[in-house]
Amino acid sequence: MPIQEAEKSYRPHRIEEKVQSFWEERDIYERVKELREDRPRYSFLDGPPYCSGRIHLGTAWNKIMKDTYLRFKSMKGFNVRRQPGWDTHGLPIEHKVEGLLGVRSKKDIEDKIGIEEFVNKCREFAVENKAVMTGQFQRLGVWMDWDDPYVTFDPAYMESCWWTLKRAHEKDLLVRDLRVITWCPRCETALALAEIDYHDKEDPSIYVKFPVSGDTHILVWTTTPWTLPANMAVAVHPDFEYAYARLDGETYIMAEALVEKVLGEEAEILKRVKGTELEGLTYRHPLDDEVPLHREIEHRVILGDHVTLTEGTGCVHTAPGHGPEDFEIGKKYGLEVICPVDEAGIFTEEAGKYSGRFVKDADEDIIADLRSKGLLLKAGTISHRYGFCWRCKTPIIYLATEQWFLKITEIKDKMLRELDRVQWVPSWAGESRFRNWIENARDWTISRQRYWGIPIPIWICEECDSIHVVGSIDELRELAVEGELEGDFIHRPHVDRIVLECGECGGRMKRTPDVLDVWIDSGVAGWAALHYPSETELFREWFPYDFITEGHDQTRGWFYSQLGCGVIALDEVPYRRVLMHGFTLDEEGRKMSKSLGNVVEPEDVIEKYGADVLRFYLLWENKPWEDLKFVWDELRNVNKMFNILWNVYVFATTYMSLDRFQPGDHSAEDLSFRDEDRWILSRINSVALKVTEAIENLHFHRATREIHDFIVEDLSRWYIRLIRSRTWIERDDPDKLAAYHTLYTVLKTLIVTLSPMAPHVCEDIYQNLVRGAEPDSPESIHMLDWILDEGAVDSQLEADMDIVREIIEACARARDTARYKLRWPVREMVVVSEDEGVLKAAESLKNVIAEQANAKSIKTSTEFPDMKIIARPNPATLGPRLRQDIPLVMRELEGADGSAVKAALDSDGEFTVETDGKKFKLTSEDIVFETELPENIVSAQFDGGSVFIDTELTPEIMSEAMARELVRRIQDMRKDLDLDVEASIEVSVKCSEEFRELTEPQREFIENEVRASTLSFDYSELEYTKEWKISDENLIISIKPAKV
């Protein structure tokens, strides 16, 4: 089917619905994959989003960047792997399901619901949300293997995770140990550092007296009174100066540097000691009455380099059961680890009086007890950064518990070496942010005391504590002596029922009840998605991955977990190139949240503007690694660009369909192209070249901005303006065919270049424009190879046209100054410049300037010869020097030839005035030059020169001007009747005899421009009549469609 005239308006929803139906009905995505099956492979790994709800704007941005880049790589000739991933385990989904089931604690889950039912509900929830989110991504036009995703709850995937843990065990990198870890009392589970969000929080700030003897106390500051029941020591810095400071009848031991800050100027220093001298000093626990176990423990001062003077007293409360640093220093001193707090954050019986209280609720009781005992110096509050559980937003606590760890500290150096193999965009993301995170990495707490997750594949002997790490489902089946798997279902509680026989003592081995940290789930995606090691073919073909991209929070998340797991399992980093992108924020730079009411849903944007506009906007708004402020006004600008593109497409198809243009009927070699044709062909290929480079470098903002500027400035505002008159001439005119051929080639290259960013509208244009003109072309635009004709690029021509456009803008400004309409021709225009490049550009493109400036003649020169130069004295320099003689100099200068004065200054550096027998030598500082143009000449400057136009209205000029004014009114009336472009009309005009005589010589021009079969000045009313005023002339114009 030949090219058809496009719909007049850009209707994104209709286009996108039609295109997505076309893709689905013709199985285009699968056919694109088949087309490039034998091409070089390009491997991509999708960072899996959680299946815990609907997508948000940030998720959309993430997938749009991925889809854009992968569509581009496919069109560049690569066989691209684009399997989507889904993160389905862990607290994000458990929390949602708890809400649906109306449970609030682990006890409720186990007693009221049951683990099996809870796990099943979690799986159902994940599956339902996966389906919803898949539909949302597809609505955005994202092409991925949606029917073959990797899903972290699939047994084959989980098996790869088990194998990774077995590898860690084989390398002695898996250990169970008692350590202080971050803990969520609401979720009743351990948390990794990556699972903690930090916010400002208000807490108590108290100064506590730890009794030494008599009225002497060690003064300690803390913001966690609830940890005092676990206090075992006070740490001081060995190198700091400490003071015994007396105030109000009591003596306080504290850092000398902080005495005045804490105790005030009244405090008297009795003596000074080094921190080392305080080591071993014993004290009585301030809560030994309330927590009786402390009566049996000797508490003393220890030394620690972690003590600082930035806050507090320089004497640090040390509770090995509640602080990582406290725990480590406690091991050094052999301190007992007391942690009288259970999984829910409730004090146990060991806490004495506080038993049964939630730890944070006990703060006030503890402070009150200290006050009543006279052991509270002062109390207040402090606002500081504090950790919160990433899912339930509960403040974390530190607990000493037995957990499973991966010994990251032992492979840290290898991880840093592997990091050097990765290319980061931007470079600083890997070189500073990520490297710093790894350098400060601690061992990884991988066990979670939850239900919906990959069960830790560790079986422990009930008799001798030996462990066995299972690496596959088949291995588990072979080793099982009790219990049976239901198919390959290895979630809790089914896997908990499997008992093994201990290889050491023959005892019963039961699985540790914990599940894995979800960051392990996604961390093994690089090989688990390929079902390695149970299958090896896909792994050999696609591993390692050429490209991944996620948000900047993943430097401590997925980027990190993949690197750690990759080094453990495979001794290498799983990815070779990383784009770290930003977050989406509201217009004011705030995080989007329901509480602020500033959330923008992707569906809302699509409903208003369509998916392509949203895609392009998110890529265009800013650099991908910066946070994106969503601004509706900017979105409207992008929508405007798409409407402009569509209008150009409508323009092209309207005239091409009318003339039944087929590019294959005319060889480019046989056509005579104008300079503007060669220029736009050069521009589109320059743009395609820059877009190619930008996308390769993951600079989507540069790519989209190049396209935006080309569509708006070069194609619509300039080239279409240049060729519009050529589309009105006879059908087979070579000049017209050259314009058609050029516009067709430009649009074809443009939609290919734009298609990765805006696949729907480009597909729609392709199906009509390209498939209509070239029926044998591939069925979808995405089956095309990337178009780039570097041979068409003419940098000099582009530079010259830039100059010409500046000249035309200057001409418009000069006309504005003279209030001289653009439709009215001018007799002559002179381009003046001292820059040879400007003059050459104006000469080489003189025809373009003449047509666009509507000038009869174009001249170029280094100066405007008719400009009069007037020389005047400068009072600022001459006044103090000449005083009463200034009038003499003024008279002589104003009577002199200004050009001669200027020439003398330029050659000699001075000009001499002789008058009334006096001589005055003047320099360039003494003379001010003004210019005066002849009558009817107006001027305007541009970067590189000036233009001068002659606005004299000769009879010939007036004739053309009035004819153009008449044409404009008739064209407006054609639009009112919504006539087809090719429709002929009859025109009748009622006007004065003078106007008729003025415009009669332009009859042929008028008839051609408005497609009039007849033009009569003997007025008779036709079908559509309208009154007009042109200058001082009142006209009546009547038109009707001509009979065919």
UniProtKB/Swiss-Prot annotation:
It is an enzyme of class 6 (ligase). Keywords: Aminoacyl-tRNA synthetase, ATP-binding, Cytoplasm, Ligase, Metal-binding, Nucleotide-binding, Protein biosynthesis, Zinc. CDD domains: Anticodon_Ia_Ile_ABEc, IleRS_core. A motif ('KMSKS' region) lies at residues 591-595. A motif ('HIGH' region) lies at residues 49-59. One of its GO terms (biological process) is isoleucyl-tRNA aminoacylation. It catalyses: tRNA(Ile) + L-isoleucine + ATP = L-isoleucyl-tRNA(Ile) + AMP + diphosphate. ATP binds at K594. One of its GO terms (molecular function) is tRNA binding. It is found in: Cytoplasm. Its EC number is 6.1.1.5. InterPro entries: aa-tRNA-synth_I_CS (IPR001412), aa-tRNA-synth_Ia (IPR002300), Anticodon_Ile_ABEc (IPR033709), Ile-tRNA-ligase (IPR002301), Ile-tRNA-ligase_type2 (IPR023586), M/V/L/I-tRNA-synth_anticd-bd (IPR013155), Rossmann-like_a/b/a_fold (IPR014729), tRNAsynth_Ia_anticodon-bd (IPR009080). It comes from the Archaea. GO terms for cellular component: cytoplasm. Gene3D superfamilies: 3.30.720.200, HUPs, Isoleucyl-tRNA Synthetase, Domain 1. Its cofactor is Zn(2+). PROSITE patterns: AA_TRNA_LIGASE_I. Belongs to the class-I aminoacyl-tRNA synthetase family. IleS type 2 subfamily. HAMAP family: Ile_tRNA_synth_type2. Catalyzes the attachment of isoleucine to tRNA(Ile). As IleRS can inadvertently accommodate and process structurally similar amino acids such as valine, to avoid such errors it has two additional distinct tRNA(Ile)-dependent editing activities. One activity is designated as 'pretransfer' editing and involves the hydrolysis of activated Val-AMP. The other activity is designated 'posttransfer' editing and involves deacylation of mischarged Val-tRNA(Ile). Monomer. IleRS has two distinct active sites: one for aminoacylation and one for editing. The misactivated valine is translocated from the active site to the editing site, which sterically excludes the correctly activated isoleucine. The single editing site contains two valyl binding pockets, one specific for each substrate (Val-AMP or Val-tRNA(Ile)). This is Isoleucine--tRNA ligase. It comes from Methanothermobacter thermautotrophicus (strain ATCC 29096 / DSM 1053 / JCM 10044 / NBRC 100330 / Delta H). The gene is ileS.
